[in-house]
């Protein structure tokens, strides 16, 4: 008994001492006791459950979502340090739902900054140190009941996303620590739990040393952003399972390598099912630790964004004849290659019609529901977006599942951005203190997402400079995963990126690169900035992309406006952006709203331009007089037999004929001439004739209904001819009867009067300041008719500071000189000489005789 008491005391002392350490300021400590990362899967009790794929229905699953006791403090040094004790009294604490973010529930304010850290208004960067003041801390407590039938099993806690870090305790004992806000943290709780009631407690800091690597251009929020749960495993289980599909040189037959890491020994039976559930291949491996096997598949259906066909691998772990657990894994057969300065998917140089997407919801912030994710993919499909970059961090696991299912190419980015440190000598890419964090974040991104066929590229991070830390990450990934390309924008065209993926390379620079001899494909990771009134020059980008083989597309910044749904003091709802919450936090104002769609997912006007330019069916003239057009199929894998065409003939804007082509057989990357049965006979030759052709789905698919228009084109059969002005029959006026009079006796104004009008010119600046016609005043009082060389700046103008660069053009009375010569008798010819300020002495209108 004395030994037990002593052991207990030592344990408590160790826990208390540990809790006083500063892991949140130590870049060498990014985790303590965190379970190794593995691919995203869930182990079910039997095959039927595995095929249904609903982990929430499994007896091995228990949610931690819902209400937690919650206590928030403004400053880190005010945080409670004993709240995790079992006998701690939390009756005065609030309730907060998990997942849920503090700032959206009344605890602190959101911060939006683009470049620079959220503390930039109060604290000078000094990595790894972060502020104590305004470093909010949230403490959580929850009592749970462990199911009785989990006895003898290993029990893990899964925290999907916690910003910016977390300390975890169970029943008063310290369990572990984790950083990296956008990847799950899992902990083995087996030795800390007891039968029946248990206390789980964790503490989260708004900022930690890891925040230096999370300086992304988005809302800075805190708390729990994704689902949290417990799951149970038998003592012997599959720790990890990786699938690597491949195709032969002809892109016909496939192989599937399955690599497993077994805890304990056992036999794993493998079978591959096609989309109809038919078994197409089997294998079996036996052993412990790391084992692998290859499966051959004859001519499998291939996965692409155009044809997202998925197979299902069923991995059954057995102990003798008894099933221990069953893991389902979705498999897509596709091959990624770099050849001749192009990225090939299944042998084809696909075009990436992409957008950058932040994980953001107007009501939940980082908490994005499955329904919202599906809505986002539906919008992408509606507007012909076929690729997404997970800017600038790993997304919810479900997002990749949905991209696999519905067909979206993914650039999977690691949670590394240190933009606020700049790109020079201070960049964290060159700082050895942060080498471990760079590596771990990239490793865990790959280890978790490896099985997703939608992931085409890995991205090392975003706007974080370049240096040895990224070089090491690139080398590790290329050794770990030889089936994908790796990109990083700051690597430029060096050997540490497979793709040249610049930001906002203009037309000239893009074309110069395409004409050069660098053997890397050009795919802009950000381009065509979609803020406000934008995309006016989008077609010009795609003229180049469609012209040069190694220019393979880009990702528009960005997909969705990031504003939050907020309310005024009077309860009126509005979309809030940076600066709306308080006057003291740093803010980059509305620069967070750069989306193709609004926060509620309604398309912004410029989205329609994107949808058109991104379409993959194009019509060009062939013999329009006889109704013949060329139809080009820009798809790489899909025939047009799943679409039909509708056409309409317009005469001066009015529809006069319509028709349909039901059968379109146009192979990928091919052009075919088709006949449209319209006739121009009987239509006045004075009328403009236009031909509209739209392509629509025959059947519902990938979230789109039957009849949905995926592409539309307009051709001119007969152009509009403006009526000619008949100058031969102009009404003749007797100039002797309409000669105006000029009064120059006013000190300020030159007055010109006629029978039905009066015009006053200001002698100081030469501008028309009064104009009356038939007794009606045409200019408001004190108004002047002045030249205007200005328009309201757009958001993108202001982003480039053009409103200041070109401010001179906004000034009324900008330096202008012009001469007016009227065809009137010599004594009345007027030549105003107008100078911009400062005006020369005596400058005014003057009458001249010629």
List each model region and its residues.
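Extended carbohydrate-recognition surfaces in non-catalytic/accessory domains of CAZymes
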Residues: 20-158, 208, 212-216, 221-224, ...
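Glycine/proline-rich low-complexity spacer/linker segments in large multi-domain proteins
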Residues: 22-39, 53-55, 175, 195-232, ...
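Accessory beta-strand-rich segments of carbohydrate-active enzymes
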Residues: 23-31, 69-73, 101-105, 109, ...
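Beta-strand/loop-rich accessory regions of lumenal/periplasmic or secreted enzymes
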Residues: 104, 113, 161, 206, ...
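Intrinsically disordered, low-complexity Pro/Gly/Ser/Thr-rich segments with frequent PxxP/GP/PP motifs
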Residues: 284-299, 653-685
């Amino acid at each position: 008994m004395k030994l037990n008491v002593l052991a207990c005391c030592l344990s408590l002392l160790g826990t208390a001492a540990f809790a006083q350490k500063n892991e949140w300021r130590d870049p060498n400590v990014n985790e303590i006791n965190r379970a190794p990362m593995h691919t995203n899967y869930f182990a079910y009790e039997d095959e039927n459950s595995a095929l249904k794929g609903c982990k929430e229905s499994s007896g091995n699953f228990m949610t931690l979502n819902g209400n937690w006791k919650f206590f928030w403090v403004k400053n880190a040094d005010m945080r409670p340090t004993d709240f995790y004790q079992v006998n701690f009294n939390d009756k005065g604490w609030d309730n907060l739902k998990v997942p849920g973010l503090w700032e959206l529930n009344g605890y602190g304010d959101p911060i939006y900054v683009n470049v620079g850290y959220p503390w930039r208004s109060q604290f000078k960067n000094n990595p790894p140190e972060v502020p104590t003041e305004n470093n909010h801390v949230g403490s959580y407590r929850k009592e749970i009941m462990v199911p009785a039938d989990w006895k003898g099993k290993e029990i893990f806690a899964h925290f999907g996303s916690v910003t910016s870090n977390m300390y975890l305790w169970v029943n008063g004992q310290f369990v572990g620590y984790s950083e990296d806000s956008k990847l799950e943290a899992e902990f083995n709780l087996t030795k800390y739990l007891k039968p029946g009631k248990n206390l789980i407690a964790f503490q989260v800091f708004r900022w930690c040393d890891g925040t230096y690597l999370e300086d992304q251009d988005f809302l800075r929020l805190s708390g729990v952003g994704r689902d949290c749960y417990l799951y149970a495993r038998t003592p012997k289980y599959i720790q990890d399972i990786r699938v690597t599909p491949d195709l032969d040189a002809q892109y016909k037959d496939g192989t599937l390598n399955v690599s497993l890491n077994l805890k304990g020994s056992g036999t794993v039976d493998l079978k591959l099912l096609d989309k109809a559930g038919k078994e197409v291949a089997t294998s079996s491996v036996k052993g412990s630790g790391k084992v692998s096997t290859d499966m051959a598949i004859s001519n499998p259906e291939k996965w692409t964004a155009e044809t997202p066909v998925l197979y299902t691998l069923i991995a059954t772990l057995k102990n003798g004849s008894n099933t221990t657990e069953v893991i389902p894994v979705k498999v897509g057969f596709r091959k990624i290659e770099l050849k001749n300065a192009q990225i090939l998917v299944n042998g084809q140089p696909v075009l990436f019609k992409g957008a950058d997407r932040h994980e953001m919801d107007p009501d939940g912030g980082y908490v994005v529901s499955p329904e919202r994710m599906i809505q986002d993919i539906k919008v992408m499909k509606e507007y012909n977006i076929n690729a997404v970059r997970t800017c600038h961090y790993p997304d919810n696991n479900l997002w990749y599942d949905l991209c696999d299912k519905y067909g979206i190419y993914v650039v999977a980015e690691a949670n590394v951005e240190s933009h606020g440190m700049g790109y020079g000598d201070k960049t964290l890419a060159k700082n050895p203190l942060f080498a471990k964090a760079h590596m771990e974040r990239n490793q865990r991104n790959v280890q978790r997402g490896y099985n997703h066929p939608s992931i085409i590229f890995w991205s090392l991070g975003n706007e974080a400079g370049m240096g040895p830390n990224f070089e090491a990450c690139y080398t590790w990934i290329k050794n770990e995963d030889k089936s994908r390309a790796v990109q990083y924008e700051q690597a430029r065209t060096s050997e540490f990126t497979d793709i040249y993926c610049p930001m906002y390379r203009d037309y000239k620079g893009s074309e110069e690169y395409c004409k050069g001899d660098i053997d890397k494909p050009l795919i802009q990771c950000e381009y065509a900035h979609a803020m406000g009134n934008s995309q006016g020059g989008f077609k010009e980008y795609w003229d180049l992309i469609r012209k040069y083989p190694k220019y393979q597309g880009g990702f528009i910044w960005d997909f969705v406006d990031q504003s939050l749904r907020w309310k005024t003091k009077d309860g009126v709802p509005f979309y809030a952006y940076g600066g709306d919450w308080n006057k003291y936090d740093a803010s980059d104002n509305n620069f967070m709203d750069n989306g193709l769609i609004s926060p509620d997912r309604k398309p912004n006007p410029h989205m329609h331009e994107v949808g058109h330019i991104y379409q993959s069916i194009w019509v060009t003239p062939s013999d329009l007089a006889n109704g013949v057009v060329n139809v080009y199929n820009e798809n790489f894998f899909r025939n047009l037999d799943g679409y039909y065409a509708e056409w309409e003939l317009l005469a001066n804007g009015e529809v006069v004929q319509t028709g349909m082509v039901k059968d379109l057989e146009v192979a990928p990357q091919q052009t075919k001439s088709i006949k449209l049965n319209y006739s121009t006979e009987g239509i006045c030759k004075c009328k403009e004739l236009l031909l509209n052709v739209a392509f629509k789905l025959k059947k519902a698919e990938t979230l789109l209904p039957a009849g949905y228009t995926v592409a539309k084109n307009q051709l001119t059969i007969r152009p509009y001819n403006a009526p000619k002005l008949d100058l031969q029959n102009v009404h003749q006026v007797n100039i002797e009867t309409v000669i105006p009079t000029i009064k120059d006796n006013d000190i300020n104004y030159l007055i010109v009067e006629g029978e039905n009008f009066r015009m006053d010119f200001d002698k100081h600046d030469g501008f028309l300041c009064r104009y009356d016609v038939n007794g009606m005043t045409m200019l408001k009082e004190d108004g002047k008719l002045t030249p205007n060389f200005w328009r309201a700046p757009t958001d993108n103008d202001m982003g480039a500071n053009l409103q200041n660069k070109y401010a001179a053009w906004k000034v009324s009375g900008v330096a202008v000189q012009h001469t007016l010569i009227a065809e009137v008798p010599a004594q009345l010819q007027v030549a105003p000489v107008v100078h911009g300020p400062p005006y020369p002495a005596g400058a005014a209108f003057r009458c001249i005789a010629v």
